[in-house]
Amino acid sequence: MKSCYCPFRGERTSLKPCVSAWWAQKSGHSRDVYLSAVPNQNGGNSLFKSLKRSAKGANVPHAKATAGLATVKMPTPEHVIIPMSMHIGAPAEPVVKKGDTVMVGTMIGKAGGFVSANIYSSVSGTVQDVAPMRMVNGSMTTAVAIKTDGEQTIDPACVPPTVTDKPSLMAAVQNCGLVGVGGAGFPAHVKLAANTIDTLLINAAECEPYLTTDCREMLECSDTIISGIEAVMKYCEIPHCIIGIERNKPECIDLLCSLVRNMKGVEVKPLPMRYPQGAEKTLVETCTGREVPQVGPSGKPGLPADAGCVIMNVTSVSTLGKYLKTGIPLVSKRVTVEGDAIAKPQNIEVPIGTLYRDVIEACGGIKEGVELGKIIFGGPMMGGAAPSADYPVLKQNNGLLLFSKQAAVLPEPSACIRCGRCIEACPMGLEPVEVVSAFNSKDFDTLKARCVDLCVACGSCTYACPAKRPVSQTMTLAKAWYLGELRKGGK
């Protein structure tokens, strides 16, 4: 390994601790923080705690061209394919069979456990098949294929629920099939079950480039956002609510401020325009000044609940408000369709299970003379590339980006120069350059010391890398390998 004179140690040393020491001086922290991870009294570690305030994220382009466009409702497609796994946790269990008639809101999948979610038909029609399918991320699940009748008849069972206390609210949330629709897909009733919450955080940051679905939700459905917040605060006995909105949405900030002005315990907090402002731990710190510990009381990774907070996406809480009013569960999704290859960029509301290709067609198709180079589901920072347009829109999908072949060309990576920019960009205060090195040598102990399990896969490190290396992808692989080794029980 190459060496150099390190003024922080007063001797020749390898570049590895020297880079760590340089960053320690630059951020105002001691070098030792970067060379060990010592548990602290709060259940976290010195690495996470010391770096928390130096975490900065990345200044990514906003590209919110569709923010001013009203949502368009898509015509009912001829077919939908609805997977039983559209959430974190156990897949739902199909409760329909081939030939069954379904309506909008008919249950087709029952939650497979506490950490799971019910799934409902988004269309009226006939079940064509219940069969295995490969998801866009490569995993396998069971899916229900439905041929639509074009009527969109609503199931008579869809009636507004009666909510009088927390248990009945939890039942309503479960019956809604509600999950985090901002991207994670975590079942909402699991979050709200905690009894140690004093602050409800509404995540309206929408910090990903291109995506404007939450912006349109705030401008078009502010009444159901407020009713959803009121229900959660009342029945979960949460005294305080903060709605966090990035400052690049002034209309949304003004509108929500006017609506909550006379609501007790509710405030709107403008957030810095810095990606990833919507990340859970970043949002908790920015809005409340609290820390989410690395390790919670149970010994598992810390959650916002360990800091007295529960986070709901703004569209999720609005969906709850709509369900309490109408009894219609989560069956449709607003999607931002953008990119230089799509003919008519817009926000479009589609039935869950609609194939990407049908969404693309509803937005005018691919521009004439443009060769499609890449389809991204989600945003450009945390989304994934789809191998084709033959995949369905899920509950948590909020973007479909279409880029030309020219725009989709990846830059040629060069050798890492250990500049430390990935360290500066990481919102979790990690050292991606060291994690990558440890992963390449399959060094479990170093990955543990470098807290690889804190990585949120935000992509800031890759964005900041001047060598154009796939740092975030390697971080994700490193985290998966580390957690896999941890599950083996031998470490």
Label each PLM-derived region with a short phrase.
Residues 239-356, 363-369:
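Hydrophobic alpha-helical positions that pack around
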Residues 180, 200-214, 341:
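Gly-rich Lys/Arg/Thr-decorated short loops/hinges at beta-loop-alpha junctions or inter-strand turns
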